[in-house]
């Protein structure tokens, strides 16, 4: 009776084909859990964000005080805000691992799935930036001023764009209200893109660590892989609650505990840690327009992955040179993030420029050359062995 019910009702049939009877490769590892963990983080962010919005006042005179009110006076408000702060860091941690797994195991060859995922990543970055401005602390205000002012580098219409975003001649009350509206609405657009991402994924099927055709050996998603996801959920929730209770402000900037003051510039303006790699690339180039182009390319380079890596093999599992290049890219990414948190002074300026060059050199030169040459080396070895 249960089997008939979940396959006869149209809604249940859709859920059944996506979560229960979905044919999945039998050898996928826990690295494949980070997609569902990212989805769980998104759900937690939306729920906690809705609760915070009920007590938030989008006014430059009240925003900081309403944030203090949430923490001090609202029942459980401190915990909800801590979950929202820590959840953002955990969300991007899961997303970075998810993207890294996609590069390592060649998931970018599912073009529709990959492109929808990159769009989701860019939307996440924009949403997080908008949310960072809302508490209207000192770092929030100056981050909004610096980042939105980058639009002025757009030829012909830069000044008009900046004033449109600001709602005036400087960052102020209209800016805060616009950012709240966009920060409230964009997560729902992210849900839509996530569903599109899932539809495309289920159309082609998941990849596997071996990089071979998975159709030879598939198992139903439930109960085998669903229990792996549930285990991942339990670990993530445990870590999130522990982090929110013990180290809630580890990733925040101390300057943001002071109200915004347009007359005092912080000695070092920096965004949250998950923006630091792109921020470091932006600062490494003295020219504003060139820096913005490099910033955009640091994210949109993911869209070019299917073109840049043209190997006959899907996964890097059997490509040792590509593995070395991949981990070099990961180390450089971490190094760039560290440099983004440093003051803009020697020797960090030169180090940022070198690390930014390495970042693009890996993607545009090393990945294409090594992927093609490693194929030829393996073919030569197979021919004469």
From Swiss-Prot:
Keywords: Electron transport, Heme, Iron, Membrane, Metal-binding, Mitochondrion, Mitochondrion inner membrane, Respiratory chain, Transmembrane, Transmembrane helix, Transport, Ubiquinone. Its main location: mitochondrion. Heme b b566 binds at residues 98, 197. It comes from the Eukaryota. InterPro entries: Cyt_b/b6_C (IPR005798), Cyt_b/b6_C_sf (IPR036150), Cyt_b/b6_N (IPR005797), Cytb/b6-like_sf (IPR027387), Cytochrome_b (IPR030689), Cytochrome_b_C_euk/bac (IPR048260), Cytochrome_b_N_euk/bac (IPR048259), Di-haem_cyt_TM (IPR016174). CDD domains: cytochrome_b_C (cd00290), Cytochrome_b_N (cd00284). It is a multi-pass membrane protein. GO terms for biological process: mitochondrial electron transport, ubiquinol to cytochrome c. PROSITE patterns: CYTB_CTER, CYTB_NTER. It is found in: Mitochondrion inner membrane. Binds 2 heme b groups non-covalently. Heme b b562 binds at residues 84, 183. A ubiquinone binds at residue 202. The chain crosses the membrane at residues 34-54, 78-99, 114-134, 179-199, 227-247, 289-309, 321-341, 348-368. Its cofactor is heme b. It holds the Pfam family Cytochrome_B. GO terms for cellular component: mitochondrial inner membrane; respiratory chain complex III. GO terms for molecular function: metal ion binding; ubiquinol-cytochrome-c reductase activity. Gene3D superfamilies: Cytochrome Bc1 Complex, Chain C (1.20.810.10). The keyword Nuclease does not apply. The keyword Nucleus does not apply. The cytochrome bc1 complex contains 3 respiratory subunits (MT-CYB, CYC1 and UQCRFS1), 2 core proteins (UQCRC1 and UQCRC2) and probably 6 low-molecular weight proteins. Heme 1 (or BL or b562) is low-potential and absorbs at about 562 nm, and heme 2 (or BH or b566) is high-potential and absorbs at about 566 nm. Component of the ubiquinol-cytochrome c reductase complex (complex III or cytochrome b-c1 complex) that is part of the mitochondrial respiratory chain. The b-c1 complex mediates electron transfer from ubiquinol to cytochrome c. Contributes to the generation of a proton gradient across the mitochondrial membrane that is then used for ATP synthesis. Belongs to the cytochrome b family. This is Cytochrome b. The lineage of its organism: Eukaryota, Metazoa, Chordata, Craniata, Vertebrata.
